[in-house]
């Protein structure tokens, strides 16, 4: 079960 991330990860550190 893969749930779409929302809000989407814009900044990734």
Swiss-Prot record:
<keyword id="KW-0878">Amphibian defense peptide</keyword>
<dbReference type="GO" id="GO:0005576">
    <property type="term" value="C:extracellular region"/>
</dbReference>
<comment type="similarity">
    <text>Belongs to the frog skin active peptide (FSAP) family. Tryptophillin subfamily.</text>
</comment>
<keyword id="KW-0873">Pyrrolidone carboxylic acid</keyword>
<dbReference type="Pfam" id="PF08248">
    <property type="entry name" value="Tryp_FSAP"/>
</dbReference>
<protein>
    <recommendedName>
        <fullName>Tryptophyllin-T3-1</fullName>
    </recommendedName>
</protein>
<dbReference type="InterPro" id="IPR013266">
    <property type="entry name" value="Tryptophillin"/>
</dbReference>
<dbReference type="GO" id="GO:0006952">
    <property type="term" value="P:defense response"/>
</dbReference>
<feature type="modified residue" description="Pyrrolidone carboxylic acid">
    <location>
        <position position="1"/>
    </location>
</feature>
<keyword id="KW-0964">Secreted</keyword>
């Amino acid at each position: 079960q893969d749930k779409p991330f929302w809000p989407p990860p814009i900044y990734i550190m």
